[in-house]
Swiss-Prot record:
GO terms for biological process: symbiont-mediated perturbation of host defenses. Keywords: Allergen, Glycoprotein, Secreted, Signal. This is Allergen Bla g 4. Glycans are attached at residue 72. It is found in: Secreted. Probable ligand-binding protein. Belongs to the calycin superfamily. Triabin family. GO terms for cellular component: extracellular region.
Amino acid sequence: AVLALCATDTLANEDCFRHESLVPNLDYERFRGSWIIAAGTSEALTQYKCWIDRFSYDDALVSKYTDSQGKNRTTIRGRTKFEGNKFTIDYNDKGKAFSAPYSVLATDYENYAIVEGCPAAANGHVIYVQIRFSVRRFHPKLGDKEMIQHYTLDQVNQHKKAIEEDLKHFNLKYEDLHSTCH
């Protein structure tokens, strides 16, 4: 029943969220852009490698990932709705298992974000660390998964102290998370 509730398009459903955000009023203008999911609490998400979310100005979302064998690249499209630190994602048919409410628990906007969500694809609950994907810092060849993995690991290492400090608020350590892109 909780999964069904979590998959609805409502920001009012608090049943999905287990933690209070450190950023109650997310600045969506600063959050917009591309983010790579580096690691998360759900082992189920490890089958989706180097997941990249691109949040755009018109509430459109384009997400790309590679399968666990690193062979098939998939693109899914959806819409987002932000309110406070929470947002919902409503993907098209191909991405429905990821349509869910999410909450930004912590972010410095420029380098990393810690997000909590309730997608069915993560067995109903996940906390994950995202790394800001900036072409100013990195410009991989299209589809070059190894370059994206290297970039992600490098960015995690550069900002690990701050990430670890924020994860402590949620009783987590980075090394306890399941890697999804390094």
